[in-house]
């Protein structure tokens, strides 16, 4: 999975599906993983709030080219909603802005769920990374600015009430599309139920195609490096000790299960490597303007657009 390069770090490629702990920022997690693997390049496929835990897909090397396709995948969340308070951030971190003595019954909650299933309009939280006139909403909110975030369409595939905690929080599980804010959902349900609500606990359990079975903890990653061979407090391993750590990576092309795959011959592969379009005459080839993957000798070669049997490469992979 790795090769020599003049650039700083190793040209290592693959996915780390990190079980992000609470209090760790997503950018911090990426930096830690990048240092641990001594990777040239790293990025994540979907931010998790610091107060949230769970599945954070982190791409290394050539896998960063597949990040947009993972971000388009469905996400699954397990979360607790506390009723009776509205908070500035719509989660535990914020200050209380409104209170109510009312607590919803299970029947009232069940009756509300269909409203929040399917394609809905949702307004992101004031404390979010949405850009308003070039500024992040959370920066404006911290400065006390008054502003509005326009609602946008999101898709919620399923929303279930699955229990109640000892503290009286309602436990939900939701599968949704890109751009859905769980904090906004808690806020909006609280308004509809006449009692206010905020997120008391949030865990992401899936980002298609990755699931809980793919998760690995930070401690497990560090344990893959013999302690006596670490070079500093960041647990950066010596070159000869990367093999165990590299074996924990998920292959780059796993992220592309959502795309159709087609095999090229040698001449076609050479043209694609040079960034040229090619004609593909497979009778099963889609004719519409969609993305597909092409491979050569069972190796991922490129992602591109197919239209009227013409394949135009958009992202070309070096040898993985």
Curated annotation (Swiss-Prot):
InterPro entries: PsdUridine_synth_cat_dom_sf (IPR020103), PsdUridine_synth_N (IPR002501), tRNA_psdUridine_synth_TruB (IPR014780), TruB_C (IPR032819). It comes from the Bacteria. The keyword Ribonucleoprotein does not apply. The active site is at residue 49. The keyword Isomerase applies. One of its GO terms (biological process) is mRNA pseudouridine synthesis. Its EC number is 5.4.99.25. Keywords: Isomerase, tRNA processing. It catalyses: uridine(55) in tRNA = pseudouridine(55) in tRNA. GO terms for molecular function: RNA binding; tRNA pseudouridine(55) synthase activity. It is an enzyme of class 5 (isomerase). It holds the Pfam family TruB_C_2. Responsible for synthesis of pseudouridine from uracil-55 in the psi GC loop of transfer RNAs. Belongs to the pseudouridine synthase TruB family. Type 1 subfamily. This is tRNA pseudouridine synthase B.
């Amino acid at each position: 999975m790795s090769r020599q390069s003049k650039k700083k770090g190793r040209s290592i490629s693959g996915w780390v599906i990190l079980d992000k702990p609470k209090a760790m920022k997503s950018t911090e997690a990426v930096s830690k993983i990048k240092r641990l693997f001594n990777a040239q390049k790293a990025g994540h496929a979907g931010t998790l709030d610091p107060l949230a835990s769970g599945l954070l897909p982190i791409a290394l090397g050539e896998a960063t080219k597949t990040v947009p396709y993972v971000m388009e995948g469905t996400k699954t969340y397990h979360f607790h909603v506390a009723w009776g308070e509205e908070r500035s951030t719509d989660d535990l971190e914020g200050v209380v802005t409104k209170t109510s003595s009312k607590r919803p019954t299970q029947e009232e909650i069940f009756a509300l769920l269909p409203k929040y299933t399917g394609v809905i309009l949702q307004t992101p939280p004031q404390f979010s990374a949405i850009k308003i006139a070039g500024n992040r909403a959370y920066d404006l909110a911290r400065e006390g600015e008054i502003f509005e975030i326009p609602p946008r369409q999101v898709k919620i595939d399923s929303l279930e009430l699955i229990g109640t905690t000892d503290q009286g929080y309602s436990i939900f599980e939701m599968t949704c599309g890109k751009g859905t804010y769980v904090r906004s959902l808690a806020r909006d349900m609280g308004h509809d139920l006449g009692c206010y609500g905020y997120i008391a606990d949030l865990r992401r359990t899936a980002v298609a195609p990755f699931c809980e079975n793919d998760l690995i903890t930070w401690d497990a990653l560090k344990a893959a490096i013999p302690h006596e061979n670490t070079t500093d407090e960041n647990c950066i391993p010596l070159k000869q000790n990367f093999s165990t750590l590299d074996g924990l990576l998920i292959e780059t092309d796993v992220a592309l299960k959502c795309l159709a795959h087609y095999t090229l011959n040698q001449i076609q592969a050479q043209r694609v490597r040079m960034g040229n379009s090619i004609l593909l005459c497979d009778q099963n080839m889609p004719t519409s303007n969609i993305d597909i993957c092409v491979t050569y000798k069972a190796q991922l070669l490129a992602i591109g657009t197919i239209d009227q049997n013409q394949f135009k490469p958009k992202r070309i992979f070096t040898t993985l």
